């Protein structure tokens, strides 16, 4: 009887701590990531006005979109390690303020070369944010909650696109003070990141032992549980930072994510232009609203698959299935006669497939690595795979400019998504007891 009462009390403490952590941290992190994706991807809509003003070709736009990821490469591993060994609060605040200022300054570019420079610097400024947050979540969420936490955080990606399209459509119609609407778009969307960066210094705690909103028993439970998980992983295999970067599973995940990013960012950056050309629509506000639909599907898929992945404790098929769905949808577009209705259906499925996999994938590294090794692996995977974010948009632009059609680009995306799925499916199983990869 006494043991039953103690078990019930322990369960209540665990449930209370898990709920309190989720409600305290995830809404603010979600807001930061919405700002991140608004600033990263607003060029997808800005180009509808920039092309005429700056004389951009498809190839130049593809390069400008993708060069962000060249700047993004260098600082991701240091960013993840600084969160592990220094301070998430300070690093994320610095990152937000810097990228917000650079987004605002992008409104003053006048040549393609200046646009390349602005996008490169923006990528460098944003580099530490995502891997830093992934490592930060592992300091607060136990393993069985981690994919759900990542899913809720990363739901900001489709939300950023869902909001970004209509907002951009409205702002692009402005012509205040003799400035084109695309310049106002960069001006307006950089300011929230700066303000949120300042707020981060006062809102975001670094570690559980720093907060007063957890009771003592909740804090003790969380600290012990996270320590047990780290010991369980370390007991199976002790991996140093340098060993982690050469770990076969890390390398497979890296190459798999490279192909995912190549296909995904190709679609994300080019989708508004594809909609405009393939439908013949000229109303930018209409394109903005319709362009949000694929990402609504992605948001729903992300939340459902993140929940399912934790429930059945499986990651690899939850990564592959949505991407194979997107590949099949694009194949159907290439094989069937075209209509606007079919295009919107295909784009909705591609939006689902290129977003829904995210939480399952980012729950994988912490399943077989711990502490600084996991932090380094997250940074290494994301920074190396991000090269795909350069190649994807650039290849689509080059193929479109040469052929006058997006069909070659669609075929390229199909190949990338299939290769990514196969590579992650052949990864070894995870090492956390009771979890299937």
Which positions does each model-derived feature cover?
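Extracytoplasmic gate region of multi-pass secondary transporters
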Residues: 43-44, 242-303, 358, 362, ...
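Cytoplasmic membrane-interface "Motif A"-like loop-to-helix N-cap segments
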Residues: 84-96, 310-323
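Glycine-rich segments within core transmembrane alpha-helices of 12-TM secondary carriers
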Residues: 150-169, 192-193, 382-392
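Cytoplasmic helix-loop-helix junction between adjacent transmembrane helices
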Residues: 118-155
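Conserved MFS/SLC helix-loop-helix module at the cytosolic interface between two early adjacent transmembrane helices
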Residues: 74-113
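Helix-to-loop junctions at the C-terminal end of transmembrane segments
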Residues: 75-87, 301-314, 400-401
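Helix-breaking motifs and short loop linkers at transmembrane-helix boundaries and internal kinks
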Residues: 55, 87, 108-114, 125, ...
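C-terminal transmembrane helical hairpin of 12-TM major facilitator-type secondary transporters
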Residues: 315-364
């Amino acid at each position: 009887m006494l043991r039953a009462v103690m078990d019930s009390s322990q369960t209540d403490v665990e449930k209370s701590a898990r709920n309190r952590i989720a409600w305290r941290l995830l809404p603010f992190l979600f807001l930061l990531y919405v700002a991140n994706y608004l600033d990263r991807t607003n060029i997808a809509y800005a180009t509808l006005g920039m092309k005429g003003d700056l004389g951009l070709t498809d190839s130049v736009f593809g390069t400008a979109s993708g060069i962000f990821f060249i700047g993004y490469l260098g600082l991701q591993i240091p960013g993840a390690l600084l969160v592990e060994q220094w301070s998430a609060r300070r690093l994320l605040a610095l990152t937000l303020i810097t990228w917000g200022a650079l987004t605002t300054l992008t409104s003053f570019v006048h040549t393609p070369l200046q646009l390349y420079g602005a996008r490169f610097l923006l990528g460098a400024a944003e580099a530490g944010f995502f891997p830093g947050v992934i490592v930060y979540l592992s300091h607060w969420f136990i393993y069985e909650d981690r994919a759900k936490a990542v899913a809720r955080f990363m739901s900001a990606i489709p939300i950023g696109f869902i909001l970004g399209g209509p907002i951009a459509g409205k702002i692009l119609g402005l012509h205040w003070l003799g400035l084109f609407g695309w310049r106002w778009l960069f001006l307006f969307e950089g300011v929230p990141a700066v303000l949120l960066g300042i707020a981060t210094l006062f809102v975001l705690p670094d570690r559980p032992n720093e907060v007063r909103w957890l009771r003592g028993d909740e804090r003790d439970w969380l600290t012990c549980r996270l320590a047990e998980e780290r010991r369980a992983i370390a007991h199976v295999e002790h991996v140093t930072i340098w060993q982690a970067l050469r770990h076969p599973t890390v390398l497979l995940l890296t190459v798999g994510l490279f192909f995912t990013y190549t296909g995904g960012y190709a679609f994300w950056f080019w989708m508004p232009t594809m909609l405009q050309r393939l439908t013949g629509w000229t109303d930018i506000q209409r394109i903005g609203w319709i362009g949000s639909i694929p990402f609504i599907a992605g948001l729903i898929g992300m939340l459902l698959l993140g929940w399912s992945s934790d429930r059945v404790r499986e990651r690899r098929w939850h990564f592959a299935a949505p991407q194979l769905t997107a590949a099949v949808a694009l194949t159907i577009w290439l094989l069937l006669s075209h209509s606007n209705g079919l295009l919107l259906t295909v784009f909705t499925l591609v939006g689902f497939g290129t977003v829904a996999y995210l939480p399952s994938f980012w729950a994988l590294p912490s399943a077989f690595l711990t502490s600084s090794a996991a932090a380094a692996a997250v940074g290494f995977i994301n920074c190396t795979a991000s090269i795909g974010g350069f190649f994807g948009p650039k290849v689509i632009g080059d193929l479109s400019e040469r052929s006058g059609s997006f069909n070659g680009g669609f075929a390229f995306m199909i190949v990338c998504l299939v290769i990514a799925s196969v590579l992650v499916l052949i990864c070894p199983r995870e090492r956390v007891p009771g979890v299937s990869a």
